[in-house]
Structures are given as C-alpha cells and as structure tokens.
C-alpha cells in the first residue's frame, strides 16, 4: 500500500519509533514543504509551549531529515485542483496539497491532524465531486502498529 505522510503523522511516527521509523515509512511519499512544517512545529513546542528543549527538537529534526532520504519527496501535479480543494473544504493550501498528492498517487493520506481529518470527512461529497474519487485517511498509529 502507498502512503502520503503529512507533517503531523511523520513527526509522530519519528517521536514514537525514532530511527526505527524507517522500517514503517521507507518508500512512502511526503511533500517538499513537510520538513519546514515539522521544523516550525518543533520551534513552537520548544519556544512558545516549552514542551521540549531545543536539544530535543534538534535531535528530532535531524532524525526526520535523515529519514527523508528514504522517502519520495513530491509536489502536487495540479495546483489548480489543489486550490479548488482548499477552497471547497476551507482548509489551507498546504493541507490540500497532501490530499491532492494522495489522490494523484492513489495512496492513503496518513495524518494526525484532527481538523484536517474532520474537514475531509465532512467534505467527502465535495472531494468526490472535485476529484472524481475519494482519499483514504489513516493515522500514524495505524502505520506504527502495522
């Protein structure tokens, strides 16, 4: 099965499995923007929320960057479709990019972003109409436990 990992899922997989994450995600797909989203999330957790130290954040980001060498890093092929989905579902263009890539690759979208999951589920009719198909959603726990 093919997987597109969004930043929330990739970050949670790395946090849970560390370098052992490679076994679960090798050959999966992610977007060019993913490392930046993860870096921003780690910055926020270290700087604003004080959940982790800068050292912990740096270690996690370094692990992510090493794992990215074993993933297919891609971009959506159809930017107009991406914008249309962002508009219809009222989500960010970033989030819509993950949906479009999953659709284009006939892959499952792995996300732990509750808000995104809810929007996709609530907007399934709109997605069906715009894409002509549906996108299967999974969580990082489903990947970790597989």
What are these regions (language model features)?
Residues 12, 40, 118:
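Alpha-helical elements of the RecA-like P-loop NTPase motor core of helicases
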Residues 1-35, 50-55:
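Short, well-structured N-terminal submotif of metal-dependent ribonuclease cores
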Residues 111-146:
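Acidic, PIN/NYN-like endoribonuclease modules and their adjacent C-terminal/linker elements
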Residues 40-47, 103-104:
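Short glycine/serine- and small hydrophobic-enriched flexible loop segments
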Residues 50-55, 65-76:
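Helix-adjacent hinge/juxtasegments
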Residues 35, 39, 61, 79-82:
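A general structural signal for well-ordered alpha-helical segments in protein cores
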Residues 70-119:
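Active-site neighborhoods of divalent-metal-dependent phosphate/nucleic-acid chemistry enzymes
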């Amino acid at each position: 099965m093919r997987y597109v990992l969004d930043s929330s899922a990739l970050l949670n997989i790395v946090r849970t499995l560390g370098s052992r994450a490679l076994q679960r995600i090798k050959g999966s797909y992610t977007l060019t923007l993913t490392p930046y989203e993860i870096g921003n999330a780690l910055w926020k957790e270290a700087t604003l929320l004080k959940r982790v130290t800068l050292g912990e954040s740096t270690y996690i980001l370094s692990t992510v960057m090493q794992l990215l060498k074993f993933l297919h890093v891609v971009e959506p092929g159809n930017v107009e479709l991406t914008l249309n989905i962002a508009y219809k579902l009222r989500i960010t263009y970033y989030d819509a990019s993950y949906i479009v890539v999953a659709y284009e690759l006939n892959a499952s979208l792995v996300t732990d972003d509750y808000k995104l999951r809810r929007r996709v589920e609530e907007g399934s009719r709109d997605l069906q109409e715009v894409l002509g198909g549906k996108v299967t959603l999974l969580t990082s726990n489903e990947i970790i436990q597989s």
